[in-house]
Regions:
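C-terminal structural segment of proteins
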Residues: 1-112
Length: 112
């Protein structure tokens, strides 16, 4: 694995600023795909920006506007949360089924 610098921003705005300032950064959340790729030398970012502590990227919520009703699934929402969410099961049951079938339970608890 190549050397890299690790950053853990405290807000989404900080993460965006870091990304714009760094040479060849990559965002990391669960790390289930990126870290093995780095170990195999298939990816070599100069910096990793860890998004896992940014609560504004988590969760599932219903959005209502004048034309339609939509769901927002945050990028840091774990697969198991998607699989078990009542809104997902009601409006997009296939998405819940797919999320429940990803990997094993450890992957679903960690993967985003």
């Amino acid at each position: 694995m190549y050397a890299f610098d690790y950053h853990r921003p405290t807000s989404l705005a900080d993460a965006k600023t870091l990304y714009a300032q760094l040479e060849d950064p990559m965002y990391v959340s669960g790390g289930m795909t990126l870290i093995p790729s780095m170990k195999q030398r298939l990816a070599a970012p100069s910096d990793l920006i860890d998004l896992s502590s940014l609560s504004e990227l988590e969760g599932i919520e219903q959005l209502n506007d004048a034309q339609d009703s939509m769901l927002r699934v945050g990028g840091m929402t774990r697969h198991n949360e998607v699989a078990g969410n009542a809104l997902i099961q009601r409006h997009f049951p296939v998405l819940g089924q797919v999320a429940a079938a990803i990997g094993d339970n450890q992957v679903r608890n960690r993967g985003t």
